[in-house]
Amino acid sequence: MSSSWIVGLLAFLVSLVALTQGLPLLEDLDEKSVPDGRIVGGYATDIAQVPYQISLRYKGITTPENPFRHRCGGSIFNETTIVTAAHCVIGTVASQYKVVAGTNFQTGSDGVITNVKEIVMHEGYYSGAAYNNDIAILFVDPPLPLNNFTIKAIKLALEQPIEGTVSKVSGWGTTSPGGYSSNQLLAVDVPIVSNELCDQDYEDFGDETYRITSAMLCAGKRGVGGADACQGDSGGPLAVRDELYGVVSWGNSCALPNYPGVYANVAYLRPWIDAVLAGL
């Protein structure tokens, strides 16, 4: 058996893994859904309001004739570095992605398009708890032309947000469970929920692996619902005053009163991010 044939087979298997693990679906979790950044109860916004937001577009290895399609969101850290969710990129390779910045839409060729050259996924992803350490760093080339208007870097949080602080989540996707995705960039404002309360809310969700860890933070209108991130755009930003506090990760369905959205905790994961960047 030739080595080239083996490489081709491995690439095909990786592509299959990506379809099942890269974007978890409702049926994958026995009627437990994983928010991937779909905005529920939000409003149309302009990229100038969230200029750090990017569209991460994907194409399967076995379908090179297909166009790159929006898969996840992400945030610009600097001209060559994007922060996104680990579950967006697990089982895939860099050449399957392009990053589009400075656009209001998840389709089309407006905005600035660049290539993903390297993916660094947290080595502790899913260790100890479902979706634990759900973060990844993408390196792109050519560099993004930052302009402080539609393409702008965002600072990474160093401290935990205070409970009740209103945060902004942005992204593309459907506006209701099972609905159609939005081509227009959307945003929603949600208050931070303490990890203690969030863990109580998720106590009866799934098995014991679905718990809230220090590597996560929660946000949502607890007891009210109606506003949340959800399936369709994982990896997108949760920001407070133009500072990145969270990366859209998972949760139970969308905008339910007693199930806040769960995000990767940027402040807690900052040492890992800094170590990755220092290793360049």
Curated annotation (Swiss-Prot):
**Hydrolase listed as a keyword:** yes
Signal peptide extent: 1-22
The chain's disulfide connectivity reads: C72-C88, C198-C218, C230-C254
Name of the molecule in the record: Trypsin zeta
Top-rank taxon, per record = Eukaryota
Major localization class: secreted
The molecular function terms of the Gene Ontology recorded here are:
serine hydrolase activity; serine-type endopeptidase activity
UniProt site (Required for specificity): D228
Name the family: Belongs to the peptidase S1 family.
Gene Ontology cellular component list: extracellular region
Its lineage reads:
Eukaryota, Metazoa, Ecdysozoa, Arthropoda, Hexapoda
Q: Does the keyword Hydrolase apply?
A: yes
Q: Where in the cell is it found?
A: Secreted, Extracellular space
- Origin species, per record, is Drosophila melanogaster (Fruit fly)
